């Protein structure tokens, strides 16, 4: 299997895999990533935010956007699906950890707010830049 490169590829593979799992569980998942929804997938009755990681998340914090945190606190059907070991590219090797209900609520009580920025870096600009210290 070819390893996946980049966050978008890892996230896309994880979301596709979760949607397959949801269908196998008899639910009807819909990808809501580009629809302004607070989570990646609506799979009634569940609202699912997929957190995709190239390797394990053991010992790491899970980032949530403010709107995801608000939805998680408000909606008892909000779930975090943590998909690990995605980078290697073989769905048979992916692992899933599901956080929902009281367990998720207990974790949310300990959440720490952070503030940060993501700076868009278009491919054209990336490709046009010099390598190394010769900037």
Task: Name each model feature, range by range.
Residues 22, 41-54:
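Conserved catalytic cores of phosphodiester-cleaving nucleases, focusing on short active-site segments
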Residues 83-135:
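Domain-level recognition of nuclease-like catalytic cores that cleave nucleotide substrates
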Residues 29-42:
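Active-site metal-binding core of divalent-cation-utilizing nuclease and nuclease-like domains
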Residues 6, 12, 26, 36, ...:
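Residue-identity detector for glycine
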Residues 25, 50-104:
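Catalytic cores of nucleic-acid endonucleases
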Residues 1-30:
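Acidic-basic catalytic patches of nuclease active cores, encompassing PD-(D/E)XK
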Residues 28, 62, 119-121:
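Intrinsic-disorder/low-complexity coil detector
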């Amino acid at each position: 299997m070819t390893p996946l490169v980049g966050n978008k590829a890892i996230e896309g593979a994880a979301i596709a895999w979760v949607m397959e799992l949801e269908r196998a569980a008899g639910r009807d998942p819909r990808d809501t990533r580009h629809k302004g929804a607070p989570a990646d997938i609506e799979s009634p009755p569940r609202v699912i935010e997929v957190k995709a990681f190239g390797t394990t998340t053991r010992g790491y914090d899970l980032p949530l956007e403010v709107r995801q945190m608000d939805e998680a606190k408000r909606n008892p059907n909000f779930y975090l699906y943590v998909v690990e070991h995605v980078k290697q590219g073989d769905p048979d090797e992916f692992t899933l950890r599901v956080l929902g209900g009281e367990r998720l609520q207990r974790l949310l009580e300990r959440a720490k707010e952070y503030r940060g920025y993501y700076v868009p870096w278009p491919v054209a600009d990336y490709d046009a830049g010099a390598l190394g210290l010769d900037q």
